[in-house]
Amino acid sequence: MYAEETNNVTAIKDIRAREILDSRGNPTIEADVILADGTIGRAAAPSGASTGSREALELRDGDQSRYMGKGVKKAVANVNSQIRSALMDKDVTAQQAIDDAMIALDGTENKDNLGANAILAVSLAVAKAAAKSQSLPLHQYIADLRNQTSLTMPVPMMNIINGGEHADNTVDIQEFMIEPVGFSSFSEALRAGTEIFHSLKSVLKSQGLNTAVGDEGGFAPNLRSNEEAITVIMQAIEQVGYTAGKDIHLALDCAATEFYKDGKYVLAGEGNKSFDSQGFSDYLVGLARQYPIISIEDGLDESDWDGWKYLTEQIGDKVQLVGDDLFVTNPAILQEGIDKKIANAILIKFNQIGTLSETLDAIYLAKKNGYATVISHRSGETEDSTIADLAVGTAAGQIKTGSLCRSDRVAKYNQLLRIEQQVRASYRGREEFIGLRG
């Protein structure tokens, strides 16, 4: 189970962690893994705002005298002591064995002792150091871990209007996204999305609406309804000459757990309009029929499996239904969803599970069972762009990494542009989506 010791240049000779700041100004953990030949792999853990109840534990200090209780000195100490001691002199290329060693060292199901943030920062830094030691780009190293021979560039889910937990506004649905599916390359898709983002700003300004941005770089205006967010995006698409439903499709992240109260889905921004499970499912079905929506994430509460079953039966053959809080990147929970025919896609956030190896397990379990995979950032991000390499190296097909502003989001898009220039990787566009293939 434990990584074997090695005397070669790929031996781990030091591990160092520190507190850094994420895109919300909160502390997170960054780790360096240093090899015998001086090679350094560096990675940082992201942090979420709306989180699933079954996510692996993000260890925070709880000391109100520092960073309002959000410090991560305990996680840093765990890396600099226990994890460092356990991994010294191990072969950095033994990713699975190293991840298994950290899981065993923690000894809990949800990584409660060491913290998933501590373990993840080291797991990703190990992969980066290993890739450098073999003179491989990170995406190729990740591909080689699971013998992924064909690489693809992901379709970006671009979050251009923020609501819910990601913005201080009246919009209940957390993310309104565009998917540029009608293009032949990632770079052209990115250009189209960027043009629509700027067009949306002018549409909002012309209507006297706020153009400040939320956590993930999307605009955060106060709107009269969730549907109004869709209509202003449709205007922005048309204004720059693209066709909604052909060049560009729409996607929603409801983050429904955040407005699920006492068995009801309550839209506070629409006068506390209330729905039961079937009623809210029907509301989403109606939106998907009226507008070119090809993906709905967390359309229902993470515990409302009957509701998920109903929604999947209604539109699961036409619309991508993505489980985020529902599956929390956990292979065991995903398998339960597969068995019960719940949803048809999974959002992949590696800090929900805590190691690169377990993340890959979830991705390939989904692929094996015909579920789409969407690699995702968190609302609290850093300049770390590992998810870009993960998306290409696993041929995931889709990536969700925010809007077209804020350097913490753009860093991932820029890394994808670099990768596209380096490798032969197709951009599959419409073929990635259940309702658009053929």
From Swiss-Prot:
- Active-site residues, Swiss-Prot/TrEMBL: E216 (proton donor), K349 (proton acceptor)
GO MF, one annotated term: phosphopyruvate hydratase activity
Look at the named UniProt entry and state the broad enzyme category this protein falls under.
lyase
Tell me where it resides: Cytoplasm; Secreted; Cell surface
Q: Where does (2R)-2-phosphoglycerate bind?
A: Q174, K349, R378, S379, K400
Instruction: Answer yes or no on keyword GTP-binding.
Output: no
> Which residues does the annotation say bind Mg(2+)?
D253, E297, D324
Cellular component GO terms, alphabetically? cell surface; extracellular region; phosphopyruvate hydratase complex
Among PROSITE patterns, the record links this protein to: ENOLASE
Give the principal location in a single coarse category. cytoplasm
State the signal peptide span: none
User: Which biological pathway?
Assistant: Carbohydrate degradation; glycolysis; pyruvate from D-glyceraldehyde 3-phosphate: step 4/5
The UniProt catalytic activity note for this protein reads: (2R)-2-phosphoglycerate = phosphoenolpyruvate + H2O
Mention any Pfam family matching this sequence.
Enolase_N
Cytoplasm in keyword set: yes
The entry's keywords: Cytoplasm, Glycolysis, Lyase, Magnesium, Metal-binding, Secreted
| Catalytic activity, EC | 4.2.1.11
- Cofactor detail note: Binds a second Mg(2+) ion via substrate during catalysis.
* Essential cofactor(s): Mg(2+)
Q: Name one GO biological process term.
A: glycolytic process
Known function: Catalyzes the reversible conversion of 2-phosphoglycerate (2-PG) into phosphoenolpyruvate (PEP). It is essential for the degradation of carbohydrates via glycolysis.
Q: Which NCBIfam families match?
A: eno
Indicate the quaternary assembly: Component of the RNA degradosome, a multiprotein complex involved in RNA processing and mRNA degradation.
Entry's family note: Belongs to the enolase family.
**This chain belongs to which protein, by name?**
Enolase
UniProt organism field: Psychrobacter cryohalolentis (strain ATCC BAA-1226 / DSM 17306 / VKM B-2378 / K5)
Lineage summary: Bacteria, Pseudomonadati, Pseudomonadota, Gammaproteobacteria, Moraxellales
